[in-house]
Amino acid sequence: MNSWFRRAATQGRSCNLGIPQASDGPILRASRCVLAGTFLVLCLNAVPVGAQSLEEEVRAMRIELRRLQQEVGTLKEELRRRTAPAESAGSGSQGSQEKSAAAQEPAAAEVLPLLQAQVAEHAQVKVESNSRLPLKIFGTIVSNTFWNSGEANWLDVPNIVAPSPDAPVPKGSFSSTMRQSRFGVIVDGPAIGSLKSSGFLALDFFGGIPNFQTGQVMGIPRLLYAFARVEGEHTAVEIGQDQMILAPRNPTSLAAMAFPDLYRSGNLYLRVPQARVEQRIAAGDLDEFQLTGGILAPIAGDFAANSLVFVPPNLAGERSRRPAAQGRVAWRRRFSYGSEDRLEIGVSGHYGRERPVMGPRRSWAGAVDLDARAGRLGIGGEWFAGRNIDAFGGSLGQVAKSTGGFLEGRLAATRRLELNAGVGIDRLFDFDLFPAPLRQNRSVFANTIFQITPELAASFEYRWLMTTPARGEMRRNNHLNLALAFSF
């Protein structure tokens, strides 16, 4: 189909789709070419989804073809009617007609290449859903080759340093994985009055590995994002799984896509089902306030099973029988029109209830976040304090009280090369009232990201982690990661 289309498209104005030919002048030739291009577009759009759908598509094309043939007949009749007086006027009139035809010839020559280009572009990017809504497929193939000097809890994306193994087992690790690769779809939905609707879905392969001899190379798909969104000029409503409202900042990294850098070292993070409302309020030409509020699924409790299960268990969050609530107020300022230089400061909070076996308890947190850019320099970070926020990576993933945060610096050295570095810490407090196996976690990272082409990027990242247990020696790990990412 595509090769045929390319051959037909390169034939220029002599294209023929079985429509009666005539030599009545450039207007008719342009009409035939427009009809040919339209027929090609119709053929291209006829993507079958089944036998019945194919028959419907063919039937619709035949009806459309008959309609277009009737229009061509009408054009031919109109052309004959207009040229009849000119033919009886003599040679002088014939000369003016030739001039008119010469003037119309460039117009037809301009229309056809444009139509061919549009149809060719349509063939390259056209993806269609069952409901005929515009659909875009995207993805990133990510390769991570890594090395650890110590005992990392997650080899490819470490965030806690585990105790050293008993002798004679050596410390450290080396391997490579593709399980941070991801793909998804974006759907442009129908307009609802003045509102635009859209949908977003993304998955990766970080959902675990099967209990098999070579399970390391069999990453299980994991749902990342899945939400529907309706938005207007200043207001948006979203329902589905997205990053939580609390503490939305994350460090910049190509090697840590499944879980962000500094997770459990001052960076709170969770993707969770939710329903949220966003409101933007202008405060001058360059300033605006952003208000966000919503309710979230009550995610809490440690899933202790060592194997995959078919249904979610009824843990401390679900047993609370009520959603969690989060909100954020942010002020954003652009330094000038058309510039990416900006400053944004936000304050956010979380409140929820949990009901473990020992009785009900509260979960709360407050956070301040910052993001700024000036020229090639950028800075970002957040600070938080909270209780029972283990589901967000707070308190080192433990049921306790803690405070922490992170700070990141960014430098766009060139249009293709960027340098990033940051430091984070998570420290428990009220340790006597809320004891836990781990007391503190610190992390430092630095990376370079080089954009080889718009689709291909490479990154080298170094991470240093130090975990302090309640008893015993501090544990350290050096992590090196070479990441390659191809986006489509």
For the regions a protein language model found, what residue spans apply to each?
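Outer-membrane beta-barrel "beta-signal"
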Residues: F450, R475-F488
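Detector for outer-membrane/organellar transmembrane beta-barrel domains
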Residues: G327, R332, G338-L438
